[in-house]
Amino acid sequence: EDELGITFEPDIDRLVARSDIISLHCPLTPETDKIINADRIAQMKGDAYIINSSRGELIDEDALIHALETGRIAGAGLDVYTHEPAVDSRLFDIPNVVLLPHLGSATFEGREASGERVITNIRVWADGHRPPDQVLEGWQ
């Protein structure tokens, strides 16, 4: 910690209250659903920013919108949204938010791997077998 100039804070409420920037990088689980809620947003510093490039449901979007509209926090950067692919239209008119179209996986390697999976699925299906990534049961 000293070498990196950081301090580990195991208590999320203290972490939220002390942080200048909160950047979410965790999976969506029952424990993390709306981990950033109205109470935690109220604890944030007025000049704090929140960044979410993980899962939209990690943030209570209504509470975040209210905090952004009222200036309760300085701003937000969002790459994911609660009801993807839809984005809450209230976010479009808020000047202190940056909205991205879920670019977190948009690396060259990620796109290449996705393309390879598509090709594999098509080949398997064309050979009369069930594609490994088939989503709809019973589809032929």
Predicted features and spans:
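Rossmann-like adenosine-cofactor binding region
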Residues: 1-90
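C-terminal helix-to-coil terminal segments
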Residues: 84-140
